[in-house]
Structure formats: structure tokens, C-alpha cells
């Protein structure tokens, strides 16, 4: 996960306690969940740690206030930029993707992997784990449905390496019914 954040600095913190791009950012977001039927349920609390990896700079809003923009990334993004893979990888593309996440990026998050077909060999020559996963994503064919439509993404529940068809196969969260007006004109 990655994103950017803009905040106002009323106290000159950016100048007095400089933000240089190596700080930890903790986002704690409270959001109501939607129950089946459309009613609101208990609030969900999203609590995640990120690392600031870029400071866009500060822009003066008025004499005592400046707006500061920072970019942030999850720990796996930081690790990905520091790790170089330089070896031969053998297995299905889904196995290789899982290996990159678990062994190389050392993620503790849940990894959802849809099995792909065929044993492959990748000669990694000084590339990042995410580069290898993206290569696997572009070439993988689903073992279950034979489709080459893999996607790789991260959600709040973990990392996903799966085909578009498997995402379509999940049950709908809501159903929408269109009712036509049955009035007749004589």
C-alpha cells in the first residue's frame, strides 16, 4: 500500500523538527461497516503503520501556516527497494510470487494466491521482488480456468495474486433489483 498525505503545519514543526522522509506514519481510521441489507453495522477500525519515503515540500498557505505533502509506503515497499534478487527461480508463477512475498519481502500479512499452471524458470538478474511478481503476473495462466488475467495487489486483508475470473467468482456484497413501473396506458 502507498499513498500521499497533505497536512497543515501551524507550529513550524517541519522547520523545527525536520521531516526528512524516514519517519513512521501510523494511520488509524474509523469507518462504519455496511451490513447486508444496506444498514450500518459496527465501526471498523483500520490501524496501519507506514513509512514516509518522500517529502514533497511545504507551501505557505498564510504567514503562519504551511501545507506539507508527504508520500508513504508500507514496510514491504521499503524492503522491496532494498532487496535485489539475483538467482534462478523455479516453480509455478504463483509459487514464485508467494516465495517473493514470504521469503524475500518477509511479509507477515496474509497472502492469497490462486494456483497457476506449469512449472517455469525465471533467471532473476538484479531485480526487485515486486518486479519478479509483476513478471509472474503478466505470464501466469490460471490452473483452474486457463485464463491469463492475473492481478497483483494489496488490500487491508493482505496481498493478492489471482486472476480476474476468481474475483468475479466471489459472492456479491449487495444485490440490486430494478423494478419497472407496471402502469399501462389504454
Task: Please tell me what each predicted stretch does.
Residues 14, 81-90, 118-124:
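Second-shell loop/turn segments in exported
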Residues 67-69, 74-76, 111-186:
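Short beta-strand-centered interaction patches in the first periplasmic/extracellular domains
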Residues 35-39, 44-45, 107-111, 144-149:
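Short secondary-structure capping/junction motifs at helix and strand boundaries
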Residues 28-33, 94-99, 183-186:
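Short, cationic low-complexity segments
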